[in-house]
Amino acid sequence: AGDGYVLAALLAEAGIDVHIILLEEKFSPDGAYFFARARACGIPASLWEAGTDLRGYDCIADCIFGTGFHGEVRGAAADAIRAINKSGAFVVSADINSGLDGDTGEGGLCAVSSLTVSIGFYQPGHFRGRAPEVIGRLVNCDIGILPLGEILEYR
């Protein structure tokens, strides 16, 4: 979710109309920080309500789960992913599509995206399992993480 809050703030600063929809009001320390920054940009936020129709949105950022997700999507997250998939919007997934396992690319219900932006590194799950049929175009966003060889050389 933290990636989504950063993206929302950057888009708002660029003059793009943004709305954050939360599945719950529970944040990690980093998530709370970046959510507060997004809200400071004047971005409205609301809690997900079952049955919400997302068909009026042009673009949706899928930032529900990241590469550490394993298991089955349930509850509000499952409802939100179904709505994303029915929206007809251009869907951008951060790191990996919500619902896909970052190691295996397997998953039941998952977000189907037009574009998946890997943050820092590609994950094995981008190329395995169901991933090739649901990730859309895949690009990597270099965030300046040094390759292991350079880190070891620095030590």
What is each model feature region?
Residues 1-63, 72-94:
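Nucleotide and nucleotide-moiety/phosphate-recognizing core
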